[in-house]
């Protein structure tokens, strides 16, 4: 271990997602191991380690396990931006899901006389998107038991903290070109999904909402949730909406609002840390 101080791990894919957290960090110390950068310090009254994991499921999972191996971690948090799926959510809002699934761990079905069919013997349980049939992943938990699992739960105490915070926290509307008409809100509970894809497609977004009732989607959180669950560590992901995936000028919205979304997520993340 790099140090023996009990810490909360806070992961973000990009520097912009961790910017507000790094600004608020005190007693900061940098640690580099084989190219991996970890920043320890105090944040919202808690000892933490900030980790920029990089975009993608593999990067996120690798960074999460690496952090658990190198530090004495009590809780795992992901903070940053995401694409909106639920049409009721707006850019700048923060979504704290109750569970995360890996919607692009899939079977590519064969086309038959009546349409695409999944492989025999591989359970799906969810409707398909063309040839794509989502399936559970095989996981081994901290008790050593192996099972098929689609949803990875968020720690109840961390959800409770988020719900209490949602009543009082005031999120930013931004400023200048990145200013919103209405003050964003925090939504707690429900589903969210992650996969190795930047989604700029309305049909896929609609499918994800109808099939999984997901509030948001991203490229990292479910992978970190998977690692946290296997290690028996409490987990939460806090995601600010930078765009509505595939809607209108979604890619332009992302460019304009990803920092605001990340900063709003950071505000909620720090509130949750204070409550732990």
Q: What role is predicted for each listed range?
A:
Residues 2-6, 32-276:
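Glycine-rich phosphate- or other oxyanion-binding loops that anchor nucleotides, phosphorylated ligands
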Residues 24-28:
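Short Gly/aromatic-enriched secondary-structure transition segments
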Residues 7-16:
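Gly/serine-rich nucleotide phosphate-binding loop at the start of the catalytic core
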